[in-house]
């Protein structure tokens, strides 16, 4: 069954998952014509392989620590930190601890 995306004007809880984190999955919170917001959830040691998207990206760490590698550089971010990546940049993510983050992607047509 598909998870319903948030509707315009609907508030979505994006706070830390805490002890629930290991049981959660990566989920798209909403997707519009120009923007997609994803809750990234990774347990310690798990990763997303290198990939790229055409649009610009922000990664805002909510809890834990993640290592985002982009253009051969490592960027370790923790709670309250945000990383901006240009569109078309190859990047990968490794969870250094159990972590969740909000990933915002500008959708380019």
Task: For the regions a language model picked out, list residue spans one by one.
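A generic "binding-loop/recognition-motif" signal
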Residues: 44, 54, 73, 89, ...
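A cytosolic small-molecule/anion-sensing beta-strand core signal
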Residues: 62-63, 78-79, 97
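Short acidic-glycine-tyrosine-enriched beta hairpin
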Residues: 72-87
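Ligand-binding loop in jelly-roll beta-barrel domains
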Residues: 87-109
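Histidine-centered metal-chelating micro-motifs
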Residues: 47-49, 83, 87-92
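Short, conserved beta-strand element in jelly-roll/cupin
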Residues: 41, 52-67
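A short, N-terminal "cap"/entry segment at the start of jelly-roll beta-barrel domains
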Residues: 1-34, 69
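Conserved short histidine dyad/triad with adjacent acidic residue
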Residues: 23, 36-53
């Amino acid at each position: 069954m598909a998870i319903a995306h948030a509707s315009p004007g609907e508030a979505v809880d994006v706070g830390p998952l805490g002890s629930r984190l290991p049981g959660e999955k990566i989920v798209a919170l909403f997707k519009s014509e120009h923007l997609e917001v994803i809750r990234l959830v990774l347990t310690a040691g798990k990763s997303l392989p290198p990939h790229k998207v055409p649009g610009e990206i922000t990664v805002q760490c909510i809890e834990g620590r993640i290592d985002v590698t982009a253009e051969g550089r490592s960027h370790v971010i923790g709670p309250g930190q945000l990383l901006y990546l240009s569109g078309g940049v190859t990047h990968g993510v490794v969870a250094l601890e159990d972590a969740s983050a909000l990933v915002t992607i500008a959708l380019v047509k």
